[in-house]
Amino acid sequence: MSDKTVKSTNLMAFVATKMLERQEDLDTCTEMQVEKMKTSTKARLKTESSFAPRTWEDAIKDKILRRSVDTSSLDKWQELKQELENVSDALKADSLWLPMKSLSLYSKVSNQEPSSIPIGEM
């Protein structure tokens, strides 16, 4: 074998060895990243699962919201909705009944006089 072939073979072996070492470093790094992600995900799940899912209605009931919210209109809403459902079909067929009824309901919920409600606000 010639000296040139031996040198090129040694050089190729050196490059291949370095590439394999680099690949092992990358694999180790990737494994470490995956383990870190798993650990942080488990920690996050422990933290998040300790809180029960809540709705804004629950927060209002528990008075946790920073601003006080007037819930009196929420109480009226069920009553007004029931009243609307109880109206006969004959009245619903009247073309003026629905706009007038919605204006009346809006004024009850918003505590405003019907004449003071801007048209675009309904």
Curated annotation (Swiss-Prot):
Query: What does UniProt give as GO cellular component?
Result: host cell nucleus; virion component
Which UniProt keyword terms apply here? Host nucleus, Host-virus interaction, Transport, Virion
**Per the Swiss-Prot or TrEMBL record, what residue ranges does the short sequence motif Nuclear export signal cover?**
96-105
Pfam annotation, one family: Flu_C_NS2
Main localisation: virion
Q: Name where it's found.
A: Virion; Host nucleus
Q: Which domain of life is it from?
A: Viruses
The UniProt function text for this chain reads: Mediates the nuclear export of encapsidated genomic RNAs (ribonucleoproteins, RNPs). Acts as an adapter between viral RNPs complexes and the nuclear export machinery of the cell. Possesses no intrinsic RNA-binding activity, but includes a C-terminal M1-binding domain. This domain is believed to allow recognition of RNPs to which the M1 protein is bound.
| Subunit structure of this chain's protein | Binds M1 protein. May interact with human nucleoporins and exportin XPO1/CRM1.
> What name has this protein been given in UniProt?
Nuclear export protein
What is the source species? Influenza C virus (strain C/JJ/1950)
* Gene name of the record: NS
